[in-house]
């Protein structure tokens, strides 16, 4: 029996949709900084065991369609405090990092370094998947059975050989650039030598991608979104770190991670996590990107600390206003 794919998110109410657009514009308005270098090559996947009691497979869980409750809007003072805390965490790690989070319950956003450029590593595979779907539709067809199998291997198991072939299929750099424009990216550039793992992107553009996958915005159809999300929600357990740190019991988590050591940075690690967390009490889009960690483990730890720091502050921050209860 075919696996049931998750349901799609319905349109936001008009007022909330307007608020979300305005909030996203504020998130994307962070002043840019110089982009990082690019990867010489993509590294093979590494495994990290998920602790006992960790994320369970989400294959049969529908995406939450009822609005999540709770959350709070950060006051300017609390926003500044959170920004300073995030900056200290990054500085203490010795790495460089950027994070963007959008709370779909309230429209609240937080970003730090959201316009900074980072090499994607395997996060590029999520963009390649969306672009492949658009490419097939332009040809008047759906993905073939072989393509669906390849995409599954690329997203769930981070297969690099498959990514090489699918990057060729979307048209290498010209095809990628066209797809980036259709998805609304403003700070994403393919590697000049066509190395997909060296694609330069920003946390802000990854939020744009997540909105294209999670909401009815963007060029993807409901069935196309559901297919890609179904793969993101069933990644191999050893790759289910990062964004999932924000999840509670029973929450739906969809993500794609990227990780690789960089010879050009003395073997220090680039570690990225992009995805969403949805449940009765939370509904987040999250993109966190980093480079310069001393090893894989510390890079994952930094990613998860940033995720939990920001989402915890958005849950019910001291001095914040619960959703629907503006300050006086």
Q: Where do the PLM segments sit?
A:
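Glycine/charged-rich beta-loop-alpha catalytic/anionic-binding loops adjacent to active sites
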Residues: 106-115, 187-190
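Conserved catalytic neighborhood of penicillin-recognizing serine enzymes
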Residues: 136-186, 202
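Penicillin-recognizing serine hydrolase domain
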Residues: 2-19, 25-27, 32-68, 73-97, ...
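Short alpha-helical patches at coil-to-helix transitions and adjacent helical residues
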Residues: 123-126, 156, 160, 200-207
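A mature extracytoplasmic/lumenal domain signature
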Residues: 103-105, 114-116, 122-124, 158, ...
């Amino acid at each position: 029996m075919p696996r049931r794919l998750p349901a799609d998110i319905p349109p936001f109410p008009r007022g909330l949709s307007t608020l979300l657009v305005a909030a996203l514009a504020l998130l994307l308005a962070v002043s840019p900084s110089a982009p990082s270098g690019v990867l010489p090559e993509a590294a093979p996947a590494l495994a990290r065991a998920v602790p006992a009691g960790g994320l369970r497979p989400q294959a049969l869980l529908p995406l939450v369609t009822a609005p999540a409750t709770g959350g709070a809007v950060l006051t300017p003072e609390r926003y500044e405090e959170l920004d300073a805390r995030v900056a200290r965490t990054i500085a203490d790690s010795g790495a460089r990092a950027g994070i963007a989070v959008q709370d779909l319950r309230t429209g609240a956003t937080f970003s730090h370094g959201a316009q900074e450029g980072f090499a994607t590593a395997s996060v590029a595979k999520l963009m390649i998947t969306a672009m492949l779907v658009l490419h097939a539709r332009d040809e008047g067809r759906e993905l073939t059975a072989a393509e669906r199998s390849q995409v599954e291997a690329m997203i769930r198991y981070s297969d690099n050989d498959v990514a090489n072939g699918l990057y060729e299929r979307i048209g290498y750099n010209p095809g990628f650039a066209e797809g980036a424009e259709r998805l609304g990216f403003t700070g994403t550039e393919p590697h000049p030598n066509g190395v997909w793992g060296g694609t330069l992107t920003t946390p802000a553009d990854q939020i744009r991608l997540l909105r294209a996958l999670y909401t009815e915005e963007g060029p993807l159809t409901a069935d196309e979104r559901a297919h890609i999300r179904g793969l993101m929600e069933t990644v191999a357990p050893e790759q289910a770190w990062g964004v999932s740190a924000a999840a509670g019991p029973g929450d739906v988590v969809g993500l794609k991670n990227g990780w690789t050591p960089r010879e050009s940075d003395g073997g220090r690690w680039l570690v990225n996590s992009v995805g969403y967390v949805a449940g009765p009490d939370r509904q987040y889009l999250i993109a966190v990107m980093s480079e310069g960690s001393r090893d894989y483990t510390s890079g994952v730890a930094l990613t998860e600390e940033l995720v939990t720091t920001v989402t915890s502050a958005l849950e019910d921050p001291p001095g914040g206003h619960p959703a629907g209860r503006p300050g006086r």
